[in-house]
Amino acid sequence: DHRDLHSFPTRRSSDLHHQLKFIHLAGTNGKGSTAAFILSILRATGLKVGLYSSPHLVRFNERIRVNGVPIADEKIVEYMKLFSADIRRIESTFFETTSAMAFWYFKQKKVDVAVIETGLGGRLDSTNVIEPKIAVITPISMDHSDLLGNELKSIAREKAGIIKEKTPVISSHQENAVKNVLVQKAAEEDASLMFVDS
């Protein structure tokens, strides 16, 4: 049951998508380590960097971080007070609500760049309302086949959904079936695509 990507709360935060600079990550394996690597490079240049990732290991707050510091409990409470009526009204999912909270928090903290991991797939993921400066795709393998399909090609098509028009894409080495899907999607979007060895 896929929902409209532009429903609240992501739609309510839509103005933020144009005010923040994003790096968008999708893939089956290695998203967390890749995000950490990107983060360390950006922070080494003096930039203020947000990270939205899932799942958390101990506390929910770990999902939303700025320069490695998790969002404070008080900020989570503030967000829920502001938007709880809308969240209940349209029965926003957990991940939609959390994604919108991350965008809102990164805007408040005035981050220079926000690194955003998809939670499930890519094409219909609630993070896919953003217009990233660059898309990064880690190795794709069988993943959430009950929701994304039971063939590698169908899963690759879902993950490739983060490729946007004229947006540079960097992908790790992929199996041929996956590579073909990414090449086709990049061509459709007139996006430059580069494969790198992991």
Label every PLM stretch briefly.
Residues 5, 34, 95, 178:
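Hydrophobic (often cysteine-bearing) scaffold residues that line and stabilize catalytic clefts
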